[in-house]
Curated annotation (Swiss-Prot):
Belongs to the TRAFAC class TrmE-Era-EngA-EngB-Septin-like GTPase superfamily. EngB GTPase family. Necessary for normal cell division and for the maintenance of normal septation. One of its GO terms (cellular component) is cytosol. Residues 25-199 form the EngB-type G domain. One of its GO terms (biological process) is division septum assembly. It comes from the Bacteria. It comes from Nitrosomonas eutropha (strain DSM 101675 / C91 / Nm57). Mg(2+) binds at S40, T62. Disulfide bonds: none annotated. GTP binds at residues 33-40, 60-64, 78-81, 145-148, 178-180. Transmembrane segments: none annotated. The keyword Cell cycle applies. This is Probable GTP-binding protein EngB. The gene is engB. Keywords: Cell cycle, Cell division, GTP-binding, Magnesium, Metal-binding, Nucleotide-binding, Septation.
Length: 223
C-alpha cells in the first residue's frame, strides 16, 4: 500500500540550470544515484505509479533536475544519474556542476536518498557523491536497490558490510535494502521520508517564526 505522503504527488518543474531553480521556500529531499542503479524505479515504487518518474533502459536519460511536489512545500528532487561514460564530456561536466552546486548550496535541501545497486555498491562515483554531500552536514540514507537479484542471505551480508563502512566513514548515514520489483523496503523508506519532511517542515517554521520575531523587534525608520 502506498504511504499517505505520496497520495497527492505530482510533477512540479524541471530545471537544467541552477539559475532556474524554484524559490527555496519549502523542504526538499534529493534522490541521487549512478545511471541505471534504479533511481527512477525506486521513486515510482514509493509513489505507486509505474511511470511517475521517467525510466529508461538507456542509462543517462534523466538529464535535468526534476521536482515532484507532495503537497504544499514538500518536494522530491530527482537528480541526473551519474557515471554513464557514453554521454558527451560537455554534458557530463555540466551535470557535475549542476549536481555539486545544488547539493552543496541549496538551503531548502534537508537530506539525500542515495541509490546504489546492491550488486555494485560504493562505486568511486558513489563515494564522491558522499564526499560532496558530507560537507553539508545534512542527512543521507542509502537504498540498496535490486535486492531481488540476490539471495536473501547475500543481500543481508551486503547490507551489513555497507552499514559497517558507513558507520565508520560517514557517521549518521543510514542504509536499507530495497526492491522495486517486490516493493521490499518501500514502507521503511516511506516512513523515513515522512520523518524527514516533518523534521524539515518544523525547522522551516522555526526559522520563519524567528524572522517574524526579529522584524517585530527592529524599530521602523523614524521611530
Amino acid at each position: 500500500m502506498v504511504h499517505p505522503l505520496f497520495r497527492h504527488a505530482e510533477f512540479y518543474t524541471t530545471v537544467n540550470h541552477i539559475k532556474d531553480l524554484p524559490q527555496a521556500t519549502g523542504v526538499e529531499i534529493a534522490f541521487a544515484g549512478r545511471s541505471n542503479a534504479g533511481k527512477s524505479s525506486a521513486i515510482n515504487t514509493l509513489v505507486g505509479r509505474g511511470r511517475f518518474a521517467f525510466t529508461s533502459k538507456t542509462p543517462g536519460r534523466t538529464q535535468h533536475i526534476n521536482f515532484f511536489q507532495l503537497g504544499e512545500e514538500r518536494f522530491m528532487v530527482d537528480l541526473p544519474g551519474y557515471g554513464y561514460a557514453q554521454v558527451p564530456l560537455a554534458i557530463r561536466q555540466h551535470w557535475v556542476h549542476l549536481l555539486s552546486t545544488y547539493l552543496q548550496t541549496r538551503q531548502a535541501l534537508y537530506g539525500m536518498i542515495l541509490i546504489m545497486d546492491i550488486r555494485h555498491p560504493l562505486t568511486k562515483l558513489d563515494l564522491q557523491m558522499l564526499e560532496w554531500f558530507a560537507q553539508t552536514g545534512k542527512l543521507v540514507h542509502v537504498l540498496l536497490t535490486k535486492a531481488d537479484k540476490l539471495s536473501r542471505s547475500k543481500a543481508l551480508a551486503v547490507l551489513d558490510e555497507i552499514r559497517q563502512f558507513l558507520s565508520t566513514s560517514y557517521s549518521g548515514c543510514t542504509v536499507q535494502i530495497f526492491s522495486s520489483l517486490t516493493s521490499e523496503g518501500a514502507e521503511e523508506a516511506s516512513r523515513l521520508l515522512q520523518d524527514w519532511f516533518d523534521e524539515g517542515g518544523a525547522r522551516v517554521q522555526q526559522l520563519n517564526d524567528s524572522e517574524i520575531s526579529n522584524q517585530k523587534k527592529t524599530p521602523a525608520k523614524g521611530d
